């Protein structure tokens, strides 16, 4: 048997990633030098650490079931071993003794019951058994009802309305629809991005373009074996940009051909966005910097070294001005050509996970591990609203495509927040109040996305469920349970399909047409 610390560290690192502890995974990966190991992550299946621990637990349970001489232990386990039980010293001997004691008690109780039963009349005995049976049965039903998630059968999306796309060999962290056609891009821990053709005249899930992320070693292109962490289509739908844990950003054609490799970051890229004009790409990295790239030449136009810790997210305000947030709890607004931030927002007391400008570019929303959602304006230093309602970390936020300056000007502007407290909240930002709390999820919610008309909100959680909500009433209108925890949800341009990427390597497409 051979176990190396690199192997153990890699399995722990993957477990943290798969469980949604992205910041912890990043810190552990840096401290344990994961990037310097020779382990091919694409070959390691999802949930590998849990799988090997379960096998170890089964081995200990087998030990408990066998005597020292190799014969089968005649006790019967009264309950399964927990993981903590299994690592306790002398667990085999203590469990076997506990089983013997329990068996002796049961035998004594059975003998006493038999003696008592023999002295009673048969009719009375039968009546007692019937009463006990009804009581126990009712108790069982009540427990089952409590454990099940209450989702109305009428809202469940039938299997014939869900297409499951398989091909990725590891968890799929991100997905995004092409803005002009039914092409769905996905990015995975298997060091590939994929483009799936979901148009009516295609062969659906059978057509996938594999975008392999390679690095140059010894004059050859070899797989990077690093996660694809971010991707974004340009507004014309002709180019796809990807960011990777290998530190490179890449530009691909929609046909899957590599157009440019952008290399100036000194570590993993966490976020990446095209500007609306399509001439610049913005990236955020663990090296504490953000970079504006020229999409035509692949050259870095300007690097912004203002954060004191890894940059986690970026968002364009205009074609040359953007905001960035970081684990340093700060938000900087920067402009191409300026050698310092044009605005800095401070007020969060923990890592700032995501930032988003509203459709007009006037208000900036931010969410944090400090459990707050804050709204900022370039006209003042302090936040306009400090929204506190979630009781765990807020992972992401999205503005609705409604209100002034949008295609839906007569609908009210809303903001959605997704939290590790398993809830999604919809906010009226003008009044600074929560208008709906959406509570059907059972695990942390990692992604929310508004439909193009703003009438519906999709949410994806690690409980494997995608829920579709009516934004006006807060009612659940569609629900789908996949085969893995959901990392990302997104709507196509027509607003009739929702894509979702999952921890088991699957990508599902939900057809919401009647």
Swiss-Prot record:
Which parts of the sequence belong to the F-box-like domain?
41-86
Known tissue expression:
Widely expressed including the pituitary, hypothalamus, white and brown adipose tissue, muscle and liver.
**GO cellular-component terms in the record?**
histone deacetylase complex; mitotic spindle; nucleoplasm; nucleus; transcription repressor complex
As for subcellular location, the record says: Nucleus
Official protein name in the record: F-box-like/WD repeat-containing protein TBL1XR1
Q: Which disease is it linked to?
A: Pierpont syndrome: An autosomal dominant syndrome characterized by multiple congenital anomalies, global developmental delay, learning disability, palmar and plantar fat pads, and distinctive facial characteristics, especially when smiling.
**Originating organism:** Homo sapiens (Human)
Give UniProt keywords alphabetically. Answer: Acetylation, Activator, Chromatin regulator, Disease variant, Intellectual disability, Isopeptide bond, Nucleus, Phosphoprotein, Repeat, Repressor, Transcription, Transcription regulation, Ubl conjugation, Ubl conjugation pathway, WD repeat
């Amino acid at each position: 048997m051979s176990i190396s610390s690199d192997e153990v560290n890699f399995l722990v690192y993957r477990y943290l990633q798969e469980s949604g502890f992205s910041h912890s995974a990043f810190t552990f990966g840096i401290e344990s030098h994961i990037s310097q190991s020779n382990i091919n992550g694409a070959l390691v299946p999802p949930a590998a650490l849990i799988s090997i621990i379960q096998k170890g637990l089964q081995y200990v349970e087998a030990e408990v079931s066998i005597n020292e001489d190799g014969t089968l232990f005649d006790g019967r386990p009264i309950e399964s071993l927990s993981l903590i039980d299994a690592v306790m010293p002398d667990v085999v001997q203590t469990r076997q003794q506990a089983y013997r004691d329990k068996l002796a008690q049961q035998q004594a109780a059975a003998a006493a019951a038999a003696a008592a039963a023999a002295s009673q009349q048969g009719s009375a005995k039968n009546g007692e058994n019937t009463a006990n049976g009804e009581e126990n049965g009712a108790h069982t039903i009540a427990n089952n009802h409590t454990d099940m998630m209450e989702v109305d059968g009428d809202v469940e999306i039938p299997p014939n309305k869900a297409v499951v796309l398989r091909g990725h060999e590891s968890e799929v962290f991100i997905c995004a629809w092409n803005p002009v056609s039914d092409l769905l891009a996905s990015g995975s821990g298997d060091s590939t991005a994929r483009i799936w053709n979901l148009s009516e005249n295609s062969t659906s899930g059978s057509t996938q373009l594999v975008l392999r992320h390679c690095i140059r070693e010894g004059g050859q292109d070899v797989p990077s074996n690093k996660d694809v962490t971010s991707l974004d289509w340009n507004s014309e739908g002709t180019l796809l940009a990807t960011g990777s844990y290998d530190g490179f950003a890449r530009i691909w054609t929609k046909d899957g051909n590599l157009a440019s490799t952008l290399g100036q970051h000194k570590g993993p890229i966490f976020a990446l966005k095209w500007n609306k004009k399509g001439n610049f790409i913005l990236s955020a990295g663990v090296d504490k910097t953000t970079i504006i790239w020229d999409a035509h030449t692949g050259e870095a136009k300007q690097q912004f070294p203002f954060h004191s810790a890894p940059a986690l997210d970026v968002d364009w305000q205009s074609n040359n001005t953007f905001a960035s947030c970081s684990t340093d709890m700060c938000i900087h607004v920067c402009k191409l050509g300026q050698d310092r931030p044009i605005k800095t927002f401070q007020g969060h007391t923990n890592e700032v996970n995501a930032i988003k400008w509203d459709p007009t570019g006037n208000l900036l929303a931010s969410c944090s591990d400090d459990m707050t959602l804050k709204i900022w304006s370039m006209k003042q230093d302090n936040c306009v609203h400090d929204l506190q309602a979630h009781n765990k970390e807020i992972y992401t936020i999205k503005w609705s495509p409604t209100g002034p300056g949008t295609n839906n000007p007569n609908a009210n502007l809303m903001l959605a927040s997704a939290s590790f407290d398993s809830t999604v909240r919809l906010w009226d930002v003008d009044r600074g109040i929560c208008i709906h709390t959406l509570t059907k999820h059972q695990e942390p919610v990692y992604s929310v996305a508004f439909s193009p008309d703003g009438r519906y909100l999709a949410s994806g959680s690690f409980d494997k469920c995608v829920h579709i909500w009516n934004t006006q009433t807060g009612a659940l209108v569609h629900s789908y349970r996949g085969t893995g925890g959901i990392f990302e949800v997104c709507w196509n341009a027509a607003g009739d399909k929702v894509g979702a990427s999952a921890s088991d390597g699957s990508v599902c497409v939900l057809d919401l047409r009647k």
